[in-house]
């Protein structure tokens, strides 16, 4: 499941209808008073979260959205019909930013969340409102007010349970293919993943969780280098991070960077982008063990863990051969179960 996770759109609320200049004209009442009605209000623009959507790809082509204008007022004090509101649907997890001010105006995290993004203009007053003791036949009415116009940036933050992070070619796409039905592109060159991919991991008893494959990070990603910078935000809503590292000597690490330095480099990028990401539970997955003899792979893994002073869980796997991958998924499910129990106990203690 590939995602387009950024889009920029323009929204135009409807203008209000104009007020009417009219006079009552009936048989036997040739000089009736003013009876011009008010214009209808313009339609507003809303954005609503829909759990059935998972990408912003539709906004690549449809970028301009206009609500209906209000109808003009009419004689006999008839009000103009209000313009219909326009509702734009986006995936759950979409953040809405006002481009003019760079202000976040909404964060739609639940199905059905709805946000007003452009208010329709009010209808103009008809001349019936301007009658006075000195002006019995006013020829004055007000035009409708213009509707709001905004340029909005939409950013999709994935609502995944687990986020995969690591350098390019660490094997993230291979792992997500191994443990879910997702089929991201896999090849032997960096930056194979150009968009985030989601996969649903099914564990025993029909339970499941969502895992996200984030494009590879490199040194300087938080400052815009490589492809990873724009995707770091997807990690913010995950409950657990799996940090994949290529330990195979045949690969030479990544561009000659040792596994230990790979880990530390990405930790620096997380720190730059959002220090809170380093506070999330993060497990170490040492991948490509199939490219080494078993005892060599185990010794290399233990050395890496020791050099890092790693205290969290760690695993030695071959994502390509699916060796050691499913025990990790079961362990993750058990971890989430404990999280839920702890949250329930905390609520009951209040």
Swiss-Prot record:
Q: Which UniProt keywords apply?
A: Cytoplasm, GTP-binding, Hydrolase, Magnesium, Metal-binding, Nucleotide-binding
Is the Transferase keyword given for this protein?
no
Binding-site residues for Mg(2+), renumbered to this chain: 173, 193
User: Which E.C. number(s) belong to this protein?
Assistant: 3.6.5.-
Q: Which GO terms describe its cellular component?
A: cytoplasm
Q: Which GO terms describe its biological process?
A: ribosome biogenesis
* Residues the record lists as binding GTP: 166-173, 191-195, 213-216, 287-290, 318-320
- State if RNA-binding is listed as a keyword: no
Cofactors, names only: Mg(2+)
Spell out the Gene3D superfamilies in the cross-references: GTP1/OBG domain (2.70.210.12), P-loop containing nucleotide triphosphate hydrolases (3.40.50.300)
Q: Where is the Obg domain?
A: 1-159
Start and end residues of each stretch annotated as Disordered: 127-147
Location(s) in or outside the cell? Cytoplasm
Identify the PROSITE patterns for this entry: G_OBG, GTP1_OBG, OBG
Highest rank taxon of the organism: Bacteria
Q: Which GO terms describe its molecular function?
A: GTP binding; GTPase activity; magnesium ion binding
Q: Where is the OBG-type G domain?
A: 160-337
What biological function has been recorded for the protein in this entry?
A: An essential GTPase which binds GTP, GDP and possibly (p)ppGpp with moderate affinity, with high nucleotide exchange rates and a fairly low GTP hydrolysis rate. Plays a role in control of the cell cycle, stress response, ribosome biogenesis and in those bacteria that undergo differentiation, in morphogenesis control.
**Family, per the entry?**
Belongs to the TRAFAC class OBG-HflX-like GTPase superfamily. OBG GTPase family.
Q: Which PANTHER family match?
A: DEVELOPMENTALLY REGULATED GTP-BINDING PROTEIN-RELATED, MITOCHONDRIAL RIBOSOME-ASSOCIATED GTPASE 2
Relate the assembly described in the record.
Monomer.
Q: What is this protein called?
A: GTPase Obg
Q: What is the organism of origin for this protein?
A: Stenotrophomonas maltophilia (strain R551-3)
